Amino acid sequence: MTTYLSLGLEGSANKLGVGVIKHTVTDANAENGFSTDILSNIRDTYITPPGEGFLPRDTARHHRNWVVRIIKRALDEAKISDPTKLHCISFTQGPGMGAPLQSVVIAARTIAQMWGVPLVGVNHCVGHIEMGRTITGATNPVVLYVSGGNTQVIAYSKQRYRIFGETLDIAVGNCLDRFARVLKIPNAPSPGYNIEQLAKKGKKYVPLPYTVKGMDLSMSGVLQFVESLAKRFQAGDLVVDGHQVTAEDLCFSLQETLFAMLVEITERAMAHVNSQQVLIVGGVGCNERLQEMMGIMARDRNGSVYATDERFCIDNGIMIAHAGLLAWRQGFETKMEKTQCTQRFRTDEVLVDWRV
């Protein structure tokens, strides 16, 4: 029995996360021949006033200001007094926002050289998937990856996470965030969460554009349309079928439309690969209504839905630590000269050689 430790750093958007994970290997030849222990999972979020998004330069400044303190807290909580005992430093290499990514990469390079520990660059999406699989116990699910910057339907095949469908323009989380700005919905704890709470009070469904093209979907049109409705609402001039539409109705209608599109393409992928499992990952995956709608579809197919809570579905350092350690145990290491971050790092570029 052998134990391995990894420290992970995540900072691809407005959340800065640092986590420490331990793998205890009991059978090195088996894909699942190890157990995981989460030793720490610390996160700090850059939050802007209602009606405002977060700019890359300001987000990067937040990460630079907090990263040392967050690393210290993560090590203290994990009870690691000698960080040279870590087996690897894992960091998000992409995709994401350039400036925040760069801030975290610099921190990873610095501590790796200070402590003499190898670096492992991690694909952000693969981190979400592997953490989701570990936490939920899903074996070989179709993955719906939904966040502020990404929307993809994924399935595993031949040591790659294959993309079956994705957004053609903006991500579902970005659509929700931008709508929240129009209505000046608060950004704390997140605009998507606040939209979800308002949607629970919505009673009137307002028809919105529904754009699914094969296995792909488009959300820029529905955003533009619902933004125009929101401006009419703010002017007190939004009546549908004799009903005075409220902000809650608009939130409800937007959620129902977007999530129906996601359920449709996910079901089509399940049918294609003959899967009975759906794993929802990414920040939007915390949404209970999305989980409910996906569950209705899955039950109709005698399947099941897997999702994690906000500790793991929202961007975090522990998922990066976990995915990085999986790769490191297979002999992967990112040389210092190859640690440049990239905003375009496709999920299917990663060789997933820790799976059979």
From Swiss-Prot:
Catalytically driven reaction(s): L-threonylcarbamoyladenylate + adenosine(37) in tRNA = N(6)-L-threonylcarbamoyladenosine(37) in tRNA + AMP + H(+)
Lineage top rank: taxon: Eukaryota
Major subcellular site: cytoplasm
Gene3D superfamilies assigned: 3.30.420.40
Keywords: Activator, Acyltransferase, Cytoplasm, Metal-binding, Nucleus, Transcription, Transcription regulation, Transferase, tRNA processing
Enzyme Commission number(s): 2.3.1.234
Record flagged with keyword Ligase: no
Cofactor binding description: Binds 1 divalent metal cation per subunit.
Chain sites annotated for binding substrate: Y145, V146, S147, G148, G149, D177, G192, E196, N287
Subcellular location: Cytoplasm; Nucleus
Cofactor entry: a divalent metal cation
Keyword Thylakoid in annotation: no
BP-aspect Gene Ontology terms: positive regulation of transcription by RNA polymerase II; telomere maintenance via recombination; tRNA threonylcarbamoyladenosine modification
GO molecular function: chromatin DNA binding; metal ion binding; N(6)-L-threonylcarbamoyladenine synthase activity; nucleotidase activity
Binding site for a divalent metal cation: H124, H128, Y145, D315
Function: Component of the EKC/KEOPS complex that is required for the formation of a threonylcarbamoyl group on adenosine at position 37 (t(6)A37) in tRNAs that read codons beginning with adenine. The complex is probably involved in the transfer of the threonylcarbamoyl moiety of threonylcarbamoyl-AMP (TC-AMP) to the N6 group of A37. KAE1 likely plays a direct catalytic role in this reaction, but requires other protein(s) of the complex to fulfill this activity. The EKC/KEOPS complex also promotes both telomere uncapping and telomere elongation.
HAMAP family: Kae1
Subunit text: Component of the EKC/KEOPS complex composed of at least BUD32, CGI121, GON7, KAE1 and PCC1; the whole complex dimerizes.
Name of the protein in its database record: tRNA N6-adenosine threonylcarbamoyltransferase
Gene name, Swiss-Prot/TrEMBL: KAE1
